[in-house]
Amino acid sequence: KYPPNHNRPNLKYGDEIHYGCALGLINNRPGTCSKLGVAKHAECRSLKNKRYAECYLYGIYLYNQLTTDLKFHYTTIQYNFNQVSKKHKDKKNIGESYIVAIGDYVGGRLKVWKDEKGEGEPEYIDIKNKLYKFNGSKYYHETEEFVGTRISLVYFSIL
C-alpha cells in the first residue's frame, strides 16, 4: 500500500487523495531548510523502510529492463498509485523525464501538449509497460481516465 501524499494538491481533482511517494533524492521545503539548517536536497527518509527500499530497487530494475538510453540520469522515482493527474507542468523537475505505467487497467494514456502554453489538442501516448521520454517541466501533461489498477513510475532529476 502506498502512503497518502498531501504535498501535491495541484495534481488532483477535487478532494481525492493522491497515493504515492518519491524515492531517491527529494527537495526539502525551503522553510525546513532555513529553520533546521538542512540541505536543499536530501535522500528520501522512506528508503530506510525495507518496503520502500525494495520499491526503489524494483523501479531501477524496471527502468533497466525497458530502456536503451544508458546516458539518461535521474535522481528520483515518483510512484503514483491509481492517480489521474490533472493538467500540469512539473515545477521542480530538471530536464526530461521518463514515465511508465504498469498494472491491470484500460485507458490511462499520458496526454502531452506539445505547445508550451498547453493549448490545442494533446498527443495521447500509451505508456503501459513502455517507457516514454518527455520534458514534463516544459510541456503540460495529464493522465487519461482509466479503469483498473494502475501504477505509474516517473524517473526524473532535481539536480
Predicted regions, residues:
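Fe(II)/2-oxoglutarate oxygenase catalytic core
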Residues: 1-132, 137-159
